[in-house]
């Protein structure tokens, strides 16, 4: 073999090694970024891993659940004296709920403040809005959130993850979207009514 051919092969091998090393480094950076983003998520689980979300707004509980096929429906409240019943998810309403919850599932915690229960400067000790998220078929919530007032910046809202010693801020539009969802589907006839 000529020296030129050997030089070309050595150059080719060096380029291949460089490409492999660059790819590994980019994967490591991407993994680290994804891990740090996950640490800022408000919800402790992916939306696909949740079976129900309850939003209490001014004393009224609004429950959203997934049916056996995984479609969301507005459940409403049952008195406990009712017999076994099933629900049918309206595809249009299910899509509307899925869209709102997909957005809520992406909620990121922005800032963090120490909780001072006596001062209640964020109004999270007696909130008008309280959110609970559940895994499928579980009675105890996976996480609970007391939603406080809108921050002075007008675009953030204070939220207390129950059990935390810190109040966090999230984008206020996430709460607005949940309240708009309640207004849109909470009053629709047929949603939450048992099918016997």
Where is each model-derived feature located?
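A short-motif feature that recognizes glycine-rich, charge-decorated loops
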Residues: 1-196
């Amino acid at each position: 073999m000529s020296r030129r051919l050997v030089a070309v092969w050595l150059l080719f091998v060096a380029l291949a090694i460089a490409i492999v090393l660059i790819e590994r480094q980019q994967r490591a950076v991407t993994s680290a970024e994804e891990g740090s983003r996950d640490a800022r998520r408000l919800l402790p689980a992916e939306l696909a891993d949740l079976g129900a979300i309850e939003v209490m707004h001014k004393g009224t509980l609004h429950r959203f659940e997934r049916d056996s096929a995984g479609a969301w429906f507005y459940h409403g409240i049952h008195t406990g004296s009712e017999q076994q019943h099933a629900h049918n998810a309206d595809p249009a309403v299910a899509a509307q709920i899925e869209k709102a919850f997909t957005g809520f599932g992406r909620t990121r915690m922005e800032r963090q403040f120490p909780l001072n229960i006596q001062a209640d400067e964020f109004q999270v000790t007696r909130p008008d809005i309280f959110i609970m998220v559940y895994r499928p078929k579980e009675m105890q919530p996976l996480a609970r959130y007391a939603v406080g007032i809108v921050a002075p910046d007008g675009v953030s809202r204070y939220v207390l993850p129950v059990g935390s010693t810190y109040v966090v801020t999230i984008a206020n539009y996430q709460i607005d979207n949940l309240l708009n969802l309640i207004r849109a589907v909470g009053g629709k006839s047929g949603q939450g009514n048992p099918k016997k």
